Structure formats: structure tokens, C-alpha cells
Regions:
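Long, low-complexity, polar and repeat-rich extracellular regions
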Residues: 1-148
């Protein structure tokens, strides 16, 4: 990229409201951008006045590498649900406030998301796995066995 243009695959502007993006299983949203800002480099960049929703069961990838941004969320009230066998290949940046990141990869599943930025967000694992905020990760519980 030239450094002055945006090469986002999907981008909403800061005055957008009530946006919904769904990437179904098998879907692959990608770009190849290592620009120096999240706004310019993120594969998917969602900015919302008060409500935005992204549900990902497919793949969101920045082909410039995992150290570049695949997902950026900004402004206010964006809810991101990362679920099933969906993948985010690249970093996630959070700016603004009042966001929620929900994880639903299945009970006992291991995952890791590199999340940075100065924004505020709540983190939930909808399957009850323990989750760590910052860089979101869960340690797979493997085969659990109950003995009476």
C-alpha cells in the first residue's frame, strides 16, 4: 500500500450506526497490508456511533503476516463474536469504548487472540471456558472425565 490509502477489505466510517457483518463458515475476508496505522491496515475495520456487530465463523486474515492487523474496532458499542472454527489471522486492535468481544469456539477448545489498543471492552467466553483479557486466550481442557 502507498501509506496514504486504505486497503481494508471491509471498513465502516465513524458516523456509521447499526452495521452488521457476518462471515459464515468457509468465508475468507482478506487483505495484504502492513500500513503503519490500524485504520489503514486492518482487514476488517468497524467504527460505529453506538452499535456495530461482527460475527465470524470463517477466516479474517491480513496476509501481510500475523504481526499486522486483521481486525480493528473503534468508536462505541461494537460487538464481535468469534465462533465455531473461525479464525482471525493477525492482531485485533480496540479503540474507543463500550465494546464486547464474545468467544464461542466450543467447550474445552484452545484459542489465542492478540488484542491491543487503548480502548475498553468486555470479554466473554460463551462456552464457559476460562479466558484471559489483554491477549485473549483459553487453554483447552482436553478430555475431561467425571467419575462417580
Amino acid at each position: 500500500s502507498s501509506g496514504t490509502t486504505s486497503n481494508n477489505a471491509i471498513r465502516s466510517e465513524s458516523d456509521t450506526d447499526n452495521i452488521t457483518i457476518i462471515n459464515n463458515s468457509g468465508g475468507h475476508i482478506h487483505n495484504n497490508n502492513s500500513a503503519n496505522t490500524v485504520l489503514r491496515s486492518a482487514t476488517v475495520y468497524i467504527s460505529s456511533v453506538s452499535t456495530g456487530t461482527l460475527t465470524n465463523s470463517g477466516t479474517i486474515e491480513n496476509k501481510a503476516g500475523v504481526d499486522n492487523y486483521a481486525l480493528g474496532i473503534a468508536e462505541s458499542g461494537v460487538t464481535v463474536t468469534l465462533k465455531d472454527k473461525g479464525k482471525v489471522i493477525g492482531k485485533i486492535n480496540v479503540a474507543g469504548s463500550g465494546h464486547t468481544i464474545k468467544l464461542q469456539h466450543g467447550a474445552g477448545q484452545a484459542y489465542f487472540y492478540d488484542i491491543d489498543g487503548a480502548g475498553t471492552y468486555d470479554l466473554e467466553d460463551l462456552d464457559g471456558n476460562p479466558v484471559v483479557k489483554g491477549s485473549a486466550g483459553s487453554i483447552g481442557q482436553g478430555a475431561n472425565e467425571m467419575i462417580d
